[in-house]
């Protein structure tokens, strides 16, 4: 997957290219990331990238010309078909369904805003989609862009090594993940659930599925609004609720 990022702070993206899952993906040629800094497209000796908003008010906006030229440079490098995304609190909220959609793209260009944002006409003429990572305010679009990159990269074939790792992540099937355990078998008087030590793969599968459904029911019940549970899942949920009521 090819990724282009428009940012005033390209150094921040070393967190993507040099470390962890995404760093290995870059090293193995599964992920290609390039950055464009609007400061490199300025024409004054101060490399000015902000400007006052019409109508007054606090704060500044990103200057149109350097930002637009940076986007055009990224588009030229990406070739035809690259989708331009602006990270914005006004955008569609990113969830696993959206991540799956974005992962189908061969190339993405991510525009990271700063200050009070960007000129609306840039959004209208240069941006294909706006995405948000949540209903809160950040200092810029870099952290949301890195969040999007990390979540999308996990779905690129070969990045995780085992596709099952991605399939078992929270939200991959619209549900929260089940609990996980490693050694030692006993920790401060708490034992690993016996079923996980049984070696019975079907029982383990059912336990994990039930725990996933049950955890979603307890912690994020609103997620069920967009789910169509199978007969098996419905039965497991009923058993989980019954067991929970008995232990309460």
From Swiss-Prot:
Coiled coil: none annotated. The keyword tRNA processing applies. S-adenosyl-L-methionine binds at residues 113, 133-138. It is found in: Cytoplasm. Its EC number is 2.1.1.228. GO terms for cellular component: cytosol. GO terms for biological process: tRNA N1-guanine methylation. It holds the Pfam family tRNA_m1G_MT. PANTHER family: TRNA (GUANINE-N(1)-)-METHYLTRANSFERASE. Belongs to the RNA methyltransferase TrmD family. NCBIfam families: PRK00026.1, trmD. Homodimer. Specifically methylates guanosine-37 in various tRNAs. This is tRNA (guanine-N(1)-)-methyltransferase.
